[in-house]
Regions:
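Bacterial N-terminal signal peptides
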Residues: 25-36
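Acidic, serine/threonine-rich low-complexity disordered tracts
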Residues: 44-136, 179-297
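N-terminal signal peptide c-region/cleavage motif recognized by signal peptidases
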Residues: 38-42
C-alpha cells in the first residue's frame, strides 16, 4: 500500500495575510464536504436514504462573497455516489481556485463504506489531483499529482492511520444519529489523500430560523462545535499559531424529518483575520418515497 505524506508550502511574512484568506476560504469547501447531511433514523435497520440531495452554498469571507459550493448525492439500493464543485475568487480576483470532488461506495444501514475518491483543483497554472482507493479495511492506494516528496518535518503516515477512515465525500454520510443531541456527538476519522485527521463534534446549542416560504420542517438549527485534530501528514509547527481556529469550527444542522436526514445550513471557520462562512442558498431533496422538498434561505 502506497502512503504519501502531505506537502506543506513555506511562506514569508509578506505572504501570510494572503495565505490566511486563502486557507480560510478553502477550509469552507473542505468543511462542507465533511458534513453535508446525515440520516436521521430510529435505527440503522430503518435507514431510508433519500434518492437524491442537491445543494448550493454561498462562501463568504469577512462578509464578502468569495465563491460557491455545489453538492449532489445519489442513492440506489445499497450504493451511493456524491459529487461536489467549488469556485473561490478572493482578494479582488487576485486569487482564484476551482475544485471538483467525487466519491462512491456502498451502504450498510446508515454506515458508508467508501470505494473510491477523487479531487481535482486548479489555482492559476497549478493543477493538483488526489485519487484514493479503498478496500474492506481502509485505504488501499493513493495517487497524487504532482507527486512531490513530503516535507521532512511532516508527521509520517503509518498504515494504522489509514484503517477504517472516510474520504471527505464518504464523511458526508458518516455523521448519522438517532436523536438531535447525537447529531453533534461524533468523532469522524478522515483521510484526504495527504493528511489524516479527526473531526470531533460536540453539541453547542440550538438556534431558531425563519424560512422564506413554509416548508413544513422544524424551523430550528442544531449547532455543532467541530474540533479539527491533526493525526499525521501535517507539520506540527503549522498548528502552533495557526491562522484558522481549528478548535472552534461550527456546523449548524437542520433536521428534515420528511426526508429522514439532517442538512447543514451554515458552516463557520474562524480565523485571525476574519471568519469564513458558508450558508445554504438552496437545498433540494427527493425523499425515498419521491416526495420533493425544497428549502430556500
Amino acid at each position: 500500500m502506497g502512503v504519501v505524506r502531505g506537502r506543506v508550502i513555506a511562506m514569508s511574512k509578506a505572504e501570510a495575510p494572503r495565505r490566511g484568506v486563502v486557507r480560510s476560504s478553502l477550509a469552507l469547501a473542505i468543511a462542507t464536504t465533511l458534513a453535508i447531511w446525515s440520516p436521521h433514523t430510529t435505527s440503522a435497520a430503518d435507514a431510508a436514504w433519500p434518492n437524491q440531495v442537491s445543494a448550493r452554498y454561498r462562501l463568504q469571507f469577512n462578509g464578502f462573497e468569495v465563491g460557491f459550493y455545489d453538492f449532489t448525492s445519489r442513492f440506489s439500493g445499497n450504493a451511493y455516489s456524491a459529487t461536489g464543485k467549488t469556485r473561490i475568487s478572493a482578494l479582488f480576483g487576485a486569487f482564484k481556485w476551482t475544485g471538483s470532488f467525487s466519491g462512491s461506495g456502498s451502504l450498510d444501514g446508515n454506515a458508508p463504506h467508501p470505494a473510491d475518491y477523487q479531487m481535482n483543483s486548479k489555482a492559476k497554472s497549478e493543477i493538483n489531483s488526489v485519487t484514493i482507493g479503498f478496500d474492506a479495511t481502509g485505504v488501499a492506494s493513493v495517487a497524487l499529482v504532482p507527486n512531490k516528496p513530503p516535507h521532512p518535518d511532516a508527521i509520517p503516515l503509518k498504515p494504522d492511520n489509514l484503517k477504517h477512515v472516510f474520504d471527505p465525500m464518504a464523511a458526508t454520510l458518516a455523521i448519522s444519529s438517532t436523536s438531535a443531541p447525537e447529531a453533534c456527538n461524533r468523532t469522524i476519522p478522515v483521510f484526504d489523500g495527504k493528511a489524516r485527521f479527526d473531526l470531533k463534534l460536540s453539541l453547542k446549542g440550538r438556534e431558531a430560523i425563519k424560512d422564506k416560504q413554509p416548508t413544513g420542517q422544524p424551523a430550528e438549527l442544531i449547532v455543532c462545535r467541530v474540533k479539527y485534530v491533526p493525526i499525521a501528514g501535517h507539520k506540527p509547527v503549522d498548528f502552533v499559531h495557526p491562522w484558522i481556529d481549528y478548535d472552534h469550527i461550527e456546523i449548524a444542522l437542520r433536521a428534515i424529518p420528511s426526508a429522514g436526514i439532517y442538512v447543514p445550513y451554515r458552516v463557520k471557520v474562524p480565523s485571525t483575520i476574519g471568519p469564513a462562512v458558508m450558508d445554504a442558498q438552496s437545498i433540494n431533496i427527493t425523499a425515498a418515497n419521491n416526495t420533493q422538498i425544497a428549502l430556500r434561505q
